Amino acid sequence: MKSGEKNYSVKEAMIFSQRIAQLSKALWKCVEKDWQQWIKPYDLNINEHHILSIAYHLKGASISEIAKFGVMHVSTAFNFSKKLEERGYLVFSKKEDDKRNTYIEITDKGEELLLRLMEEYDPENNSVFNGALELRNFYGKFPENIELIAILRNIYGQDFIDIFEKSLENIEENFTETDQKLVKK
């Protein structure tokens, strides 16, 4: 192959891009609806819940990290974090050696809320989970999404995937199931 020559056709690229776009949009519509229904009783929106979750799993983070790992603009991360601070779920701070960045930590009240939400998670009310259940029943496990993870690693970087994996490991290691509810060990 000559330098600058592409090993794919424009048609192939268009079909792949459109497939990903359509599937992502359809999947997001279900994810968004399920997520909103889950957190609605606690007067949270998706960004607020995501920020609480990231702050919990990272044991504190800068606003820039929240934006990066929450896949949101820095101003969105800051504004929603501010609302969570006003409600007593987060605290803001600056580090002595880094006055430029604003850091957040989840408060006890914020952690209690997040843990209550985790306890209240009901897989029966999650359409994506239910859509994948047949695959689990057939193959004995849920899809691992390795191709999707590889694509996201190429877009957002390895540290994005590491944080994503760390949050799942935290749930695996620090939570147990009691009476069909997820509770902290």
UniProtKB/Swiss-Prot annotation:
Chain ranges of the HTH marR-type domain: 13-157
Annotated NCBIfam families: PRK13777.1
Function of the protein: Negative regulator of protease production and sporulation.
Gene: hpr
Keyword DNA-binding included in the entry's annotation: yes
Name listed for the protein in its UniProt record: HTH-type transcriptional regulator Hpr
DNA-binding region: 63-86
Entry-linked Gene3D superfamilies: Winged helix-like DNA-binding domain superfamily/Winged helix DNA-binding domain (1.10.10.10)
InterPro entries documented for this protein: HTH_MarR-typ, HTH_tscrpt_reg_Hpr, MarR/SlyA-like, Tscrpt_reg_MarR-type_CS, WH-like_DNA-bd_sf, WH_DNA-bd_sf
Keywords: DNA-binding, Repressor, Sporulation, Transcription, Transcription regulation
MF terms (GO), sorted A to Z: DNA binding; DNA-binding transcription factor activity
UniProt record, GO biological process: negative regulation of DNA-templated transcription; response to stress; sporulation resulting in formation of a cellular spore
KW Transcription regulation (keyword) present: yes
Pfam family, one: MarR
Binding partners and assembly: Homodimer.
Coiled coil (UniProt feature): none
